[in-house]
């Protein structure tokens, strides 16, 4: 009979984006008495970085711990977005059970499926929380049936299918085992976790085994490895061995051990089997590596991380406006920042190219890479990035590309247009149903390159009423056809100067304008989207000729259409292969790779000729 540590439970909270997972963790923290009576607590306290708070999403996995009646519950809050799935997979190794949070109205969504699949593969015990039960449109019974169907589809074992269900309202801080009535607190959730999630095995008297699952960095203590003690004990000052991924061994001394209490990371002297801790002392510690005693070097199985599916080129900013707005503009500074990102983000890959000021950066998806760019921009970096490209992989001699599972809910009158547009992007319909409130729910498998830039088109097609989610499904044999991409050409500035109201008014018939009057522009910069398929070079700096002749009708007031200001994501989705996005702390500009019109036209002719010769 193996001993268990009944005073500890290790759980991960998984859910789809925006189903209330981080709010639920906040309430668990508050009700466990972690905060003082007079302590101010931010909403969504676990989403600690600015972008997480702005977008209302969790990007990095976070640890916290609460005490309930003498039992310490270690909670890992995981990202709900598949782009950050690299984090999710490693967390599953650190815990013994998962709390699956599902919206009482929306039910199961693609990301729920992605993360749950990882949890079931690790044989973890699930507890299902049907959240937002207080919503008027809640349909708890239907959602529980959907969850059961999903478990069966993901080949859960019999024990996992017997999952307990807790009905909760995280915003109100209430829960119960009965969907019809709510208790005043989350007590039923705490007790369900303690009753159903297995306690960790207590083998503290055996030789130490600690595996790193997440990384952090601190200017004072350097690199920090976060993980679980699987066996034995670890004390500050211990001399231990680190078994690297390639099998080599490095010795180091444990300088600090941190435990988690509420949102704080506190220094502790000792940790034992079953504890989730952070360790410092080894500079180049990496995810998946094992810490053991010198005399008992036994590595744990290496953690497998999903490969990147999307890549883009990062370049030093060489536009005419380079260096005007950013603090960090050189190749060395950008290289250092990318290396720093690699310290903690294991789903990211950075490769050098023939050019010293260009790098290929590969990640798990558009969101993953755009959040890195947004972070760099806010830190004062200037750079240029290319259109995202999917990564082609050779599997058993066949060239394969990533496919995504797309789930969308649209008003019935828009369903035909959405089906047609996904079909044009080589999507394959898996399912089509009508929801209780009359929306059409569509499920497609679509090549990932077909989804680049699709969200904007989808939103305009459904007039903002549609909901779309997509997540990586698998690699499949590559489709040879051209998929997706922008159909219209660009309006390109022919000159450097300031955009004038007079010129913008004259261009409104030509397409959609991106510029406010007075915006500085340069030759080769994209200032709008053309109505037609070809690019058009325009003079957006043209001013009205002043004469001393007055005209009675000429100066009547003209109204100008509001310019379309692109966000970073929209800019990345908009550009074509021969274009770049220039990113600075103050601006997001679009430009052609070749700024000069004559050189650009010669290059286009040359490429066209080569293609004809190859045919």
Predicted regions mapped to residue ranges:
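Structural and coupling elements of P-loop NTPases
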Residues: 1-615
């Amino acid at each position: 009979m193996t001993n268990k540590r009944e005073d500890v439970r290790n759980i991960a909270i998984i859910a789809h984006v925006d189903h209330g997972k981080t709010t639920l963790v906040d309430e668990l923290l508050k009700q466990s008495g972690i905060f003082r009576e007079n302590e101010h607590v931010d909403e969504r306290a676990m989403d600690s970085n600015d972008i997480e708070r702005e977008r209302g999403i969790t990007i990095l996995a976070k640890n916290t711990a609460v005490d309930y009646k003498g039992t310490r519950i270690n909670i890992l809050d995981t990202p709900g977005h598949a782009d950050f799935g690299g984090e999710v997979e490693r967390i599953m190794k650190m815990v013994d059970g998962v709390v699956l949070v599902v919206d009482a109205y929306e039910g199961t969504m693609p990301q729920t499926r992605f993360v749950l699949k990882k949890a079931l593969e690790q044989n973890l015990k699930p507890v299902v929380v049907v959240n937002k039960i207080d919503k008027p449109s809640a349909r708890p019974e239907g959602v529980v049936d959907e969850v059961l169907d999903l478990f069966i589809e993901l080949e859960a074992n019999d024990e996992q299918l017997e999952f307990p269900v807790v009905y909760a309202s995280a915003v109100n801080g209430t829960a119960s085992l009965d969907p019809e009535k709510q208790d005043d607190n989350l007590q039923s959730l705490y007790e369900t976790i303690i009753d159903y999630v297995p306690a960790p095995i207590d083998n503290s008297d055996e030789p130490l085994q600690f595996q790193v699952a997440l990384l952090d960095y601190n200017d004072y203590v350097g690199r920090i490895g976060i993980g679980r003690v699987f066996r034995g004990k670890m004390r500050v000052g211990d001399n231990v061995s680190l078994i690297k991924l390639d099998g080599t061994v490095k010795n180091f001394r444990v300088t600090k051990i941190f435990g988690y209490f509420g949102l704080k990371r506190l220094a502790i002297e000792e940790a034992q089997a079953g504890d989730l801790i952070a360790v410092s002392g080894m500079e180049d510690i990496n995810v998946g590596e094992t810490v053991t005693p010198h005399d008992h070097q036994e590595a744990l199985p290496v953690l497998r991380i999903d490969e990147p599916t999307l890549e883009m080129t990062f370049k030093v900013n060489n536009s005419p406006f380079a260096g005007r707005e950013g603090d960090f503009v050189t190749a060395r500074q950008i290289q250092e920042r990318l290396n720093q990102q690699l310290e903690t983000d294991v789903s990211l890959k950075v490769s050098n190219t023939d050019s010293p000021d260009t790098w290929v950066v590969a990640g798990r998806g558009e969101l993953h890479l755009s959040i890195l760019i947004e972070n760099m921009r806010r830190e004062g970096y200037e750079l240029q990035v290319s259109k995202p490209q999917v990564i082609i992989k050779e599997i058993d001699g066949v060239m394969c590309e990533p496919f995504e599972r797309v789930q969308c809910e649209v008003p019935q009158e828009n369903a035909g247009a959405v089906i047609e547009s996904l079909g044009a992007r080589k999507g394959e319909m898996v399912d089509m149903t009508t929801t209780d409130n009359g929306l059409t729910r569509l499920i497609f498998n679509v090549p990932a390159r077909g989804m680049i830039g699709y969200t904007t088109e989808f939103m305009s097609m459904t007039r903002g009423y549609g909901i779309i989610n997509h997540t990586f499904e698998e690699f499949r044999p590559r489709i040879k056809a051209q998929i997706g991409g922008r159909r219209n050409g660009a309006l390109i500035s022919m000159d450097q100067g300031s955009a004038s109201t007079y010129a913008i008014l004259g261009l409104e018939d030509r397409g959609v304008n991106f510029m406010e009057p007075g915006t500085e522009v340069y030759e080769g910069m994209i200032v709008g989207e053309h109505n037609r398929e070809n690019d058009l070079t325009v003079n957006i700096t043209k001013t009205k000729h002043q004469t001393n002749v007055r005209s009675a009708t000429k100066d009547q007031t003209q109204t100008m259409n509001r310019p379309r200001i692109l966000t970073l994501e929209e800019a990345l989705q908009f550009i074509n292969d021969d274009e770049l996005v220039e990113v600075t702390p103050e601006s997001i500009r679009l430009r052609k790779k070749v700024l000069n019109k004559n050189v650009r036209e010669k290059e286009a002719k040359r490429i066209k000729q080569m293609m004809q010769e190859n045919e």
